[in-house]
Amino acid sequence: LRSLVGSEMCIRDSTGTLSGSCNAAQLAAEEYQAEHPEAKVFVLDSLSAGPELVLLAEHIRDLLAEGMAFDDVCEEMLRYRRHTHLLFSLESLANLARNGRVKPAVAAVARMLNIRVIGKASDVGELDVLCKTRGEHGALERIVLELKGHGYTSGKVIIAHCGNPAAAERLMHMVKAVFEGAQVRVTECGGLCSYYAELGGLMVGFEDADA
């Protein structure tokens, strides 16, 4: 951090409601600015995770590359965050249950009945269950419907998978078939997201029409 004295820093992190990273970042920013009052630090609670964080990071990068002023970057990121979203499809809820995110009984029933859970990151950064489906095809079709329902038209989509590249590729082609000009790419879930998404899980970050 000594090399950043006097610098302007933008920090984005996983949702503060499910991760301690946001609180840690806020505390670090306050401590740093107390020691270096000339520095500017902006901590953005993503209210999300995984591929939606990638969209936010790329937008910050593009704004800085354009030479936008720091305060304007902060304002624009708060606006942009309102127009990015996260959907997910989970084959297992075991790890979410272990960490108190869902009830163990719900996770057990989902496993026995081969139920996939479709959900989203809410406006306050919590995990909301939208519906439950049987089988992978039904889950992918539902994600496409949810994209449309959440205002997606043709912007960026990032599909992150946990050991399920075939489903991710299939979803990518479905999105491109339904939404002309869709900008879709596939990647893998990172460490923490892989833990919660579990094997077979998908996370979909996307921009709505007003992004």
Model-derived features with residue positions:
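Short glycine-rich anion-binding loops that position phosphate/pyrophosphate groups of nucleotides
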Residues: 14-18
